[in-house]
């Protein structure tokens, strides 16, 4: 999928991301579906001991990491945690030295920092989609996340 790597002209990429976890914490997986024009790429991965929120973050991080050049990216996520983190909370966390409003360390800070770095490479728009509501891209990302989780469980 060479064309999904971006052509340097700010290619438009649509990205659907999802995370899944059994037990929370427990085995988890992440999935990404990317489309640029007629080209499509899917990715998934997982960890043996993780949380749903960590897998939601990993999906977006890995999806953006796969783009080798700056692109215009629309990210479709069903995660309020990722959506609010990037659109509402991030600026304040950074201003407070990665602390929450009640001065506690931000959970999953290394993933938020990695995501912030990846987002900085691209022009990103965020779109929230209701999970398990028939959005075809979200359904595929969910299936990929479950594949990642099953692989992490050793099945």
UniProtKB/Swiss-Prot annotation:
A GO term, aspect molecular function: nucleic acid binding
Major subcellular site: cytoplasm
Function: Endonuclease that specifically degrades the RNA of RNA-DNA hybrids.
Gene: rnhA
Binding site for Mg(2+) 2: 18, 142
Species, as recorded: Bordetella pertussis (strain Tohama I / ATCC BAA-589 / NCTC 13251)
Protein name: Ribonuclease H
GO biological process: DNA replication, removal of RNA primer
UniProt remark on cofactor binding: Binds 1 Mg(2+) ion per subunit. May bind a second metal ion at a regulatory site, or after substrate binding.
Coiled-coil regions, chain positions: none
Keywords from the UniProt entry: Cytoplasm, Endonuclease, Hydrolase, Magnesium, Metal-binding, Nuclease
Family recorded in the similarity comment: Belongs to the RNase H family.
Annotated SUPFAM superfamilies: Ribonuclease H-like
Residues involved in Mg(2+) 1 binding: 18, 56, 78
Subunit structure: Monomer.
Stretches assigned to the RNase H type-1 domain: 9-150
Gene Ontology terms: cellular component: cytoplasm
